[in-house]
């Protein structure tokens, strides 16, 4: 079993970004809150929207930073320090270019894959990358020069449906992570692929 005390959904703040691919991590946290009848509330000392859940008998905090993506670490560190949460008790959900829509993967540790939100969290924790990552596939535009416009764009309805289905499965697998650990979660989540 894994001891997760903080689940973070990376996003850019503001209505103009709410439906963009880069906010997929926040979509996942929003779904977790909804499933447990909780409302995310803005808490300025944590630079984000927060909620508290009982997940499979565990006391878990949710956080969607209201900083811009490249300053996400400020919010995560503030909450981790306040509640004395270690990096390996944190799950960070984020959009992933290298995974197609309809697929989500989870891992512990690893690099940042050029993701500015992950980069900032790593630097704020003294480059200790040993936190869990939920990588929500958004696909790749095929040209690295188009990446910024792609992640800040809205997916078409067909892709959105697949991303939503992968997030739904990831939300179900979150409890498996807490009760049965990473290996079982990987087996189930990594075998899921939403149908177009």
UniProtKB/Swiss-Prot annotation:
It comes from the Bacteria. It holds the Pfam family Pept_tRNA_hydro. The active site is at residue 22. The record marks 95 as: Stabilizes the basic form of H active site to accept a proton. Belongs to the PTH family. Hydrolyzes ribosome-free peptidyl-tRNAs (with 1 or more amino acids incorporated), which drop off the ribosome during protein synthesis, or as a result of ribosome stalling. Catalyzes the release of premature peptidyl moieties from peptidyl-tRNA molecules trapped in stalled 50S ribosomal subunits, and thus maintains levels of free tRNAs and 50S ribosomes. This is Peptidyl-tRNA hydrolase. It comes from Serratia proteamaculans (strain 568). The lineage of its organism: Bacteria, Pseudomonadati, Pseudomonadota, Gammaproteobacteria, Enterobacterales.
């Amino acid at each position: 079993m894994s001891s997760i005390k903080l689940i973070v959904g990376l996003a850019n703040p503001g209505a103009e970004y709410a439906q963009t691919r880069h906010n997929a991590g926040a979509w996942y946290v929003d779904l977790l809150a909804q499933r447990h009848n909780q409302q995310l509330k803005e808490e300025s000392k944590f630079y984000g929207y927060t909620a508290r859940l009982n997940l499979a008998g565990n006391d878990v905090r949710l956080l969607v930073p209201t900083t811009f993506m490249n300053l996400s670490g400020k919010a995560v560190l503030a909450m981790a320090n306040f509640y004395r949460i270690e990096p390996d008790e944190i799950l960070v959900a984020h959009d992933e270019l290298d995974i197609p829509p309809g697929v989500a993967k989870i891992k512990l540790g690893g690099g940042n894959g050029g993701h500015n939100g992950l980069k900032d969290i790593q630097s704020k924790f003294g480059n200790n990358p040993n936190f869990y990552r939920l990588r929500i596939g958004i696909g790749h535009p095929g040209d690295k020069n188009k990446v910024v416009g792609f992640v800040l764009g809205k997916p078409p309805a067909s892709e959105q449906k697949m991303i939503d289905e992968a997030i739904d499965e990831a939300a179900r697998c979150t409890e498996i992570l807490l009760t049965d650990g990473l290996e079982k979660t990987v087996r189930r989540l990594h075998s899921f692929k939403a149908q177009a």
